[in-house]
Design a protein with these regions (language model features):
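Long amphipathic alpha-helical segments used for membrane anchoring, targeting, substrate engagement
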Residues: 1-125, 533-569, 576-577
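Conserved structured core elements
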Residues: 1-35, 56, 181-184, 247-250, ...
Length: 778
């Protein structure tokens, strides 16, 4: 990682003191934080003074290690204290953590936190959301060139304004409508357009418990036509059907094509989105499941219609996987790499322009949609982060597949030739979207790789993206993303299945399988390095770094025999091995041989690589220098570290309150990491809260840091979204995002304003002294 003297990450403003405590009974919600706890371990945790809250430094190689309890008072009760850890992400453990745990200073209390807080006085004020009658567009040119390798467009424009255009809007209203009226708002935008009789706007409605108007029914699906005079009900009862089912979409497309034949067709998918793995849609009437890409593909195939463009007014759908599906049926594709603000697309202007000239070229249509969307979202709130891109699918079909195949194959060769770190470094630096869905900007990833094959892919992709707009300081969002596993493998099975169904290039499937498998092996072998908890105190018993040991460990684990015991923490009873994979989201399936994607040959072939690219726990020693504790590593050892973050737990006398993860840390003038903790943490309006870093986008001197605070807003589970920028370094609350839990994996479009009179309760996770998650509390 890059180091420089001084603080890293977010700026602090110390503005007061606060307390940390639990109240009431446990909520039974499951973890509201990252779910990792502070891991577990064997071995001594070192001495703690009689108060149970004294200073000591702890270190663990994996988040899956449990901390020891340390000392306790004579009556067995522990007083409050603070446990902090600095998390170092390792190249070799690309899917896990290097955890440095340290306690600095005395944060004593009897169930409360009496130290000072990094108190961000963030006011949660309602934000006005005006809608422009005519969004102001930017004078930025779109790319109108077309590669000679592009296939012929399926839609042929007649020209001269003679084309008839049918626009199909598949509007699954869900809670976006029932709670916030967002679908009604967009229909009103359509109604404000000056429409031509050559433009047919046909809308299927459904999926919402309630519609915020007096026209649309929530009991059944309906079909409407948007006209200058208002909306005309075409089908009062189109059945009570899940809008996430293929047959529902197929029937709608066929209805539109049959009843409103046209020269040009467009399909707009309106709802939540969840990216390549989750796909489109959350239907409140039929809440189980979404429309995954293989289902979307079946719906389009069965419908038998070809489109001028397919667009997603939904989050996270500008992926190569989605584009590959859409390419079979459409010439252009419009979607967002990132989550969309609640305002979504602004419909008035581009529909008016299209009505004035129904032969308007599709690049110009897409540019207007993107410019208006960007302007309208910024007018709603300057903190809205937006991405929207227009992709020429005919060009993608002719230029990308060969380049993509060569890129994937060459990446597998790097992984197989012990150059895994090249791929891991490129992946760790790639722009990532949303949180925990393993979706990254493909062009940025290829640029980071820097191989000839990667450069060729980047060039081909840039040629296909005819227009792309992103908000300020949202760096490295180039218009198309892809699934690439990193810290969470629980979605690998479903993603590989989807790849099989949609015809993803086998070379890329092999690529992510190889990468994930080597990373899984790195996680496993790291558990064998002896207990690193005592390394800060110079009490290591064996380095655990031999290739023979790694080979024996891998063989035992993959065979399920559990025979390795030479100073490692693996055994047939398997608490450490089992805990490791439990903590490593979704990885228990490896042990149970249910991970169909796992390439065991890749894991065992990487034994030498594991041995030669591991940070020896015995080197992780807290050194006292100038009155502070620091971590001294060589430049080569720091090269194995990908990122740094701070994790803090409060000892309330009965267990640990988890305050979350922040990207605040500091290096001294010698570029040694300072381990001392200054007893400060984020607070909202004076109340210390659990905070989780989500993203850190840096572009030169500009940056945008986004984090979340779990809470209950009027009794509903939400995450408050906090945004820190170079212009507003002390942060603001952008709004609240609903957490759906098991109902759907799609991501809510937009944020909820927090209004005066709302009831807000902050949440935190609570752990035993053995590192076991107990419950979540207010």
């Amino acid at each position: 990682m890059q180091r420089k003297p001084g603080s890293g990450g977010r700026q602090k403003r110390i503005s007061g003191s606060g307390s940390v405590f639990r109240r009431g009974g446990g909520l039974g919600t499951g973890p509201v934080g990252s779910g990792g706890g502070f891991g577990g371990s064997s071995g001594s945790s070192g001495d703690r003074d009689g108060r149970g809250g004294g200073s000591m430094g702890l270190i663990a190689l994996l988040i899956a290690y449990l901390l020891g309890r340390g000392g306790s008072g004579g009556n067995g009760k522990r007083k409050g204290g603070c446990l902090s850890r600095i998390i170092l992400l390792l190249v070799i453990l690309a899917l896990g953590y290097m955890v440095v745990q340290c306690v600095a200073g005395d944060m004593d209390g009897t169930g409360g936190y009496d130290g000072s807080s990094d108190i961000q006085l963030i006011e949660a004020e309602p934000t006005p959301t005006p809608k422009p009658q005519l969004a102001q567009t930017q004078a930025v040119a779109a790319d109108t060139t077309v590669s000679n390798l592009a296939r012929e467009k399926r839609t042929q424009i007649r020209g001269g304004g003679q084309d008839v255009y049918t626009i199909m809007v598949y509007m699954c209203g869900t809670d976006l409508e029932s709670n916030y009226g967002m679908a009604t708002s967009d229909i009103n935008e359509m109604l404000h357009a000056d429409l031509s009789d050559k433009v047919n706007i046909i809308v299927e409605t459904g999926g919402a418990d309630k519609w915020q108007n007096t026209v649309i029914s929530s009991k059944v699906n309906q079909i409407y036509q948007v006209k200058n005079e208002g909306i005309l009900r075409l089908e009062a009862d189109f059945g009570k059907k899940a809008m996430t089912k293929a047959e529902t979409l197929t029937e709608f497309i066929q209805y539109c094509e049959s009843n409103f034949p046209a020269d040009r067709y467009a399909l707009i998918m309106w709802d939540h989105g969840g990216g390549s793995n989750t796909g489109y849609g959350y239907d409140q009437k039929f809440p189980n499941g979404s429309m995954t890409l293989d289902v979307f593909n079946k719906a389009l195939k069965d419908a038998g219609c070809t489109f001028d463009f397919i667009g997603f007014d939904a989050c996270l759908m500008a992926t190569l996987e989605t584009a590959m599906v859409a390419e079979q049926y459409s010439d252009y594709f419009i979607a967002s790499e990132e989550t969309e603000p609640g305002c979504g697309w602004y419909y008035t202007n581009w529909l008016t322009q299209l009505s004035r000239n129904t032969s308007m070229d599709t690049v110009s249509i897409g540019k207007t949609i993107i410019d208006d969307y960007t302007a309208a979202c910024r007018q709603q709130s300057s903190s809205n982060q937006t991405t929207l891109s227009l992709i020429d699918l005919a060009e993608l079909s002719g230029t990308v597949p060969e380049a993509f195949n060569k890129f994937a194959s060459s990446t597998v060769e790097l992984i197989d030739s012990d150059s895994y770190t090249v791929v891991s470094n490129a992946r760790s630096r790639a722009k990532e979207f949303s949180s925990g869905i393993n979706q990254i900007d493909l062009i940025n990833f290829a640029d980071n790789m820097g191989t000839p094959e990667a450069k060729a892919l980047s060039e081909a992709l840039r040629g296909c993206i005819k227009y792309n707009r992103v908000s300020r300081s949202l760096a490295n969002a180039n218009g198309i993303s892809i699934y690439f596993p990193y810290r969470k493998l629980s979605s690998m099975n479903s993603m590989v299945d989807i790849y099989d169904e949609i015809g993803m290039d086998d070379a890329y499937t092999n690529c992510i399988r190889s990468f994930a498998s080597v990373a899984a092996g790195g996680q496993l072998t790291s558990s064998s390095s002896g207990s690193p908890l005592t390394s800060l105190f110079g009490d290591m018993s064996g380095s655990g770094n031999s290739a023979d040991m790694l080979s024996e460990l891998l063989s035992a684990a993959l065979s399920g025999s559990g025979s390795y015991s030479s100073g490692s923490s693996y055994s047939s009873g398997g608490s450490s091995y089992s805990d490791l994979f439990d903590m490593f989201a979704g990885m228990r399936s490896v042990k149970n041989k249910k991970a169909r994607w796992l390439d065991r040959d890749a894991m065992t072939a990487a034994e030498d690589f594991y041995a030669n690219n591991r940070l020896d726990a015995s080197r992780l020693i807290a050194t006292h220098k100038d009155g502070k504790k620091v971590l001294k590593l060589t430049d080569a050892e720091w090269d194995l570290v990908q990122d740094t973050a701070l994790n803090v737990f409060i000892d309330d006398g009965e267990g640990y309150i988890d305050l979350g993860i922040d990207n605040t840390y500091e290096f001294d003038d010698d570029l040694d990491l300072i381990l001392d903790y200054d007893k400060t943490w984020i607070a909202l309006n004076g109340q210390v809260v659990h905070y989780e870093l989500m993203s850190n986008d840096v572009d030169g001197d500009s940056y945008v840091i986004t984090g979340r605070v779990p809470a209950l807003l009027n009794g509903e589970r939400v995450d408050l979204i906090l945004v820190f920028t170079d212009e507003d370094p002390y942060g603001t609350v952008a709004g609240a995002r609903i957490v759906y839990g098991d109902e759907t994996d799609t991501v809510m479009k937009g944020l909820i304003d927090i209004k005066p009179g709302d009831t807000l309760n902050f949440l935190c996770d609570y752990y035993s002294y053995d590192g076991e998650y107990l419950d979540s509390y207010m």
